[in-house]
Curated annotation (Swiss-Prot):
It holds the Pfam family RrnaAD. SUPFAM superfamilies: S-adenosyl-L-methionine-dependent methyltransferases. It comes from Natronomonas pharaonis (strain ATCC 35678 / DSM 2160 / CIP 103997 / JCM 8858 / NBRC 14720 / NCIMB 2260 / Gabara). Keywords: Cytoplasm, Methyltransferase, RNA-binding, rRNA processing, S-adenosyl-L-methionine, Transferase. GO terms for cellular component: cytoplasm. This is Probable ribosomal RNA small subunit methyltransferase A.
């Protein structure tokens, strides 16, 4: 495996917190990341977002038939193309220079990525609907919120929306010292295993809007949150929805409402509004 410190030297970069660049340099963490994919994961075509200097890329090439890297930094994309010229020529690696939020995604079978933290939420929710196994590095606080259960302080919109697409687990905390330069916060690795949600919703978009709406007023009862956020949820007759949903659900606060109850509320809203 290529040495991550040597890759930094060859690339001539040091990382730049102002540009959200923190390179993962801990060999042990790098070696473990591909192994966090579920046993059932298809590694025919693994997507990496934010290839950096290629330390993780190198390890993914060892377990995948093909790897595609999306790297937005032109200098690093050029470095990856030069550093892995043999792998590119052999057809096992493709390097795409561009923003992972804008470029078309390849037809990947799994993704393992150390995401740029500034856009990690946006990238995660571009990947999750693809229903592929994911192993992603996040800020620890974000990771814990993503995997949180109802009734906990961390539970929120992020927990419900991520859990709509997959089972979510925090599989490893990662200290600041694993990166160069060290970020200001601790990190964590999240594994998502895709599955259908254990409930039905009439419309994914309505479900997501409703969840987003009520969590903007998480300290209020669901009754008041539904009434006060129709400009976000798009619900036309909030009073009828509140009445149809019943006292048991409407007296709770969003942080104590499980995903299946949000699904039931979305179904009620769809029926009431026609």
């Amino acid at each position: 495996m290529r040495d991550p410190d040597a890759l930094l030297v060859r690339a001539g970069v040091r990382g730049d917190p102002e540009r959200d660049q923190h390179f993962l340099i801990d060999d042990r963490v790098l070696d473990r990341l591909p192994g966090y994919l579920p046993d059932s994961a298809d590694t025919d075509h693994v997507l990496e977002i934010g290839g950096g200097t290629g330390a993780l890329t190198d390890r993914l090439l060892d377990v995948a038939d093909r790897v595609t890297v999306i790297e937005r930094d032109p200098g690093l994309a050029t470095f990856l193309t030069d550093e892995f010229a043999d792998e590119i020529e052999a057809g096992s690696l493709t390097v795409i220079e561009g923003d992972a939020l804008e470029v078309p995604l390849p037809d990947f079978t799994a993704s393992v990525s150390n995401l740029p933290y500034g856009v990690s939420s946006e990238i995660a929710f571009r990947l999750l609907p693809e229903k592929r196994p994911l192993v992603l590095m996040f800020q620890q606080e974000f990771a814990e919120r993503m995997a949180a259960e109802p009734g906990t302080d961390e539970y929120g919109r992020l927990s419900v929306t991520a859990g709509h697409y997959a089972d979510v687990e925090v599989v490893e905390p990662v200290p600041k010292e694993a990166f160069s330069p060290p970020p200001a916060v601790e990190s964590a690795v999240v594994r998502t295993t895709p599955r259908e949600p254990p409930y039905e919703v009439p419309d994914d978009e309505l479900f997501m809007r409703l969840v987003r709406a009520v969590f903007t007023q998480r300290r209020k009862t669901m009754r008041n949150a539904v009434r006060n956020t129709t400009h976000i949820s798009g619900i036309e007759d909030a009073e009828a929805v509140v009445e149809a949903a019943g006292e048991d659900l409407m007296s709770k606060r969003a942080g104590n409402v499980p995903p299946e109850a949000f699904a039931r509320l979305a179904a009620i809203a769809a029926e009431v509004d026609g």
